[in-house]
Amino acid sequence: MNPPPHRMRVRIYDVAKLAGVSPATVSRVMSGSRPVSEGIRARVLDAARRFDYQPSQLARNLRRGQAATVGVLVSDIENPHFASMVRAIEAALYDRGTRVLLCNTAEDTQKQSSYLEVMASERVMGVVISPTADGDDAISHLIDLGVPVVAFDRPVADPRADAVVADNAAAIALGTQLLVDSGRRRIGFIGGGELLSTAAERLAGYRSAIESAGFEPLTAIGDFAVEGGRRAAEQLLTQSPDLDALVIANNLMTIGALQALRASGILLPEEVGIVAFDDPPWASLLDPALTTLAQPLREMSEAVVERLFARMADRTLPPVRICFECHLEIRQSSRGRMKSAGGG
């Protein structure tokens, strides 16, 4: 048996030709649906191994009338934003008769790669993923195997993957401008880790609005976590005692920043106004209620699932990036700064 030529995508017909059998025989061997002779089975498995061939689970499931399984990888299930979006994605998949294999990577690239290997071995029909900062090789390998991949919240580096994201830069610029218009002048920004595309985009939106207003940018990195948000707020308060507003790049860092502000005895919004990215359920319950930049999570989740099913039905579709606008939920935390009694 001669070695197969190099191919980016292998079909069942290629395996059949190399093994000297029909495609139907290859299907029987790979699925174990009917017995074949040991000699034929060995030839088919050898050809499949040479090609690194993995049969389409989509086709097999459809023939058997079985439900599809889709892998969903989330980068931080404890983050209310991701929890809400994954819940909506799962509901949309369930409504389409699809089973979900859910994995939490906890922003760990090794875990992501390990889970993607599981997805490949389980022959999932598609993968929905909010990727870690790196680990793109494992995603590309999955795409090489013919598995459709749709990224959400953050795109992946491989241009063959679809993506459903928010317009992060425009949203943060909108929130920053709201504070400028309310009379704030010393507006700080608490951003996420620099390796994440969402963090870079939100920082760019802040800088654009601040520079347009002619103000000095005041930034600190909080790594999208509660403790990081607290440290970043403390840093900004120390470096800029006249700080009068904060734009915060996610809901977890907002919690930490609020802890730091209250520990310092700072009144909200009288002394420091706040606009935060993400609109968790507790935002409206705070006192003062939190002004937020809300992502349309339900619409984004539906777009993720619709794109995945379109890709599973037609693997030749060109990849797309679907970008959603965020909207301001204006509440008390962004009210204009109040002048002190007798002030000028």
Model feature map: region roles:
Residues 22, 68, 125-126, 185-186, ...:
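Short acidic/polar active-site loop segments enriched in Thr and Asp
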Residues 134-143:
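Active-site-adjacent beta->alpha loops and helix N-cap segments on the catalytic face
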Residues 75-76, 132, 333:
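Residue-level recognition of strand-loop junctions within catalytic nucleotide-signaling folds
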Residues 50-56, 110, 130-132, 230, ...:
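Short gly/ser/thr-rich secondary-structure transition/capping motifs
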Residues 1-5, 50, 88-99, 120, ...:
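Bacterial carbohydrate/catabolite-sensing allosteric modules
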Residues 106-109, 130-135, 252:
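Short beta->alpha connector loops
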Residues 1-68, 335-339, 343-344:
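N-terminal helix-turn-helix DNA-binding module of bacterial transcription factors
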Residues 38, 42, 53-126, 207, ...:
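Amphipathic helical "hinge" segments at domain boundaries
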